[in-house]
Amino acid sequence: MDTNADETAAASTASEAANATPTSVAFTEQMTGFFVLGAGDPRSAYEDARVRDERMMFELTITAPDIDEFVSGDEHEGTAAGYLDSDALGGRLPVERGWFNLFVQSGDLDERIMKYRLWLTTEGGSAVTFVGFKDVRDDPGFDLWDDTTTLFVQVLDGHVPPGADVAATGLLDPADPSVLGAGVLRIRPLDFAEQMTTFTTTGPGGAQAIARFGGLFLGRLWSTYGRLARQDDA
């Protein structure tokens, strides 16, 4: 019996199995801000909601189930799970289904659109969809920190599925009757630093997977904050 051959074959099989196992990356994000019903434009709605002290926040775990597909795919699609808490919508609402997309403009990492879509049901039993986007530009003419930490949001009537246009923000015209309300959420600096420590992985090559995801998600900010998310491979 050729023991060496058996050991070599077993090692090869194990290596192939490891390579076939997708590596996932996940992190937890918390954003807070203000939201008001009866408005459609996030910026003006934010000011109105702030005066009224109509608060909104969410805590979401964003997951890329397969880092290879997430990085190479056109839609860079992941999942979002967690909850949203809104004064205007009746309190804390669990996310029934959630999407996260990161669209890279023309393959240029200096311009990215991050999109969030959450299906929720209000305390009164109404189905609604939370949609939000960050427009992130790394060029010197824009405030990169503000872009990365600001989410413009609307809440739509019903459970609305994602559209086919991956480059679109997901928000509707402010005058669209489907828009129930709008506002703006932000990440505070200390919360952002805490967010960077929540990165986890499953599967092989965890440290490399986090670096690939982080570079795509944060662009130039990754060189500053990526050290907080470092993970040593076992």
In which residue ranges do the predicted regions lie?
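Beta-strand-enriched cores of mature, soluble protein domains
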Residues: 2-234
